[in-house]
């Protein structure tokens, strides 16, 4: 019996755990079947002890097989863990490579789809690269592929060129900054130059008067006179001609805002050009707009042109006439009424004592000089008495504003012929005579000074 057990133990040692487990299972089943048959047949139970011993031996073999299976399982698990580590590492590398691939594909697509501001700029040509690139770039070896290596070198050379251009840009910006500072200093000097020129001009006035040089004021007034409205220009030219022809003791100036006068002249030029472009079919609409504009400008009837003519009248009976100024007249032009108004500059006298009132018969300056002005002023036909300057008839004649008379010059009634109106028309020639106007102004002023 012991020899059989020893044989079984050696046999189990040679078999695999799984075969041993199956064999032990079959042996246990056979022993159990034998024990059941002994019990059923009623044979002596002396054999049961031997069967139990074999049963225990089989249990021992079963536990041994189970232990061997567990050891082998642990060994396989350990080997699996050892083999899994490089697989996981390889898998991670694969995912990284796939991610890099997708990133490169996206970057490649973005580069291909990129629309530059200068899409026609190509990479530097090979000929220019070999002729202009420095040896440090051409001697590099960046890739085993010759074409790819050449492309990388061309890109590096282009990068080198761009860096040099950036340095040049910095130098140019510094140069620009220095030039701007220099220009600022020069502008500062130029802005202060008019003050120095003004003081120099003021200091040179005595020299100019000694050398009889041309007066710069005269040129200035001539330039301003080009912007005068036609009536004021006629007055200015007549007084200047009188002064130059007869050496009359007067001074004529043009005063006012040059900027406003230029703006007004520009607006008039634009209106004239616009009126030329209008067609005949829009005459009615243009007339409605004109009527509407006149109604809206009712408050601006006394709108004055920006420039004025100032006349200085000196005493002609003393040695130094310019040392004694008799009166200073101001001629201004009313745009809406088309009349020239005259007033005494800086006069403290009332309008009743003004020497210009009734300088000629029936010419107080309160009545508009022509019918169009009367229609614009309305039913009263009265000029604004609060204004210091008035539209005298002699001023209109001096300015060349000629209108149709209210009464026909061919009178048939003797009473009408010798009326005040007829006398006024008879004196129109005196109105146009500049010397006569100056003589009367001097006479009125001297008479007033004598009475005072």
Swiss-Prot record:
Protein name as it appears in the record: THO complex subunit 5A
Function: Acts as a component of the THO subcomplex of the TREX complex which is thought to couple mRNA transcription, processing and nuclear export.
Transferase as UniProt keyword: no
GO biological process, one term: mRNA processing
Record-linked Pfam families: FmiP_Thoc5
Any one of the GO CC terms: THO complex
PANTHER family in the cross-refs: FMS INTERACTING PROTEIN, THO COMPLEX SUBUNIT 5A
Keyword Transport included in the entry's annotation: yes
Lineage summary: Eukaryota, Viridiplantae, Streptophyta, Embryophyta, Tracheophyta
UniProt family annotation: Belongs to the THOC5 family.
Major subcellular site: nucleus
InterPro entries to which the protein is assigned, alphabetical: THO_Thoc5 (IPR019163)
Species whose genome carries this gene: Arabidopsis thaliana (Mouse-ear cress)
Key words of the record: mRNA processing, mRNA splicing, mRNA transport, Nucleus, RNA-binding, Transport
GO MF annotation, one: RNA binding
Quaternary organization: Component of the THO complex, which is composed of THO1, THO2, THO3, THO5, THO6 and THO7.
Disulfide bridge map: none
Record localization: Nucleus
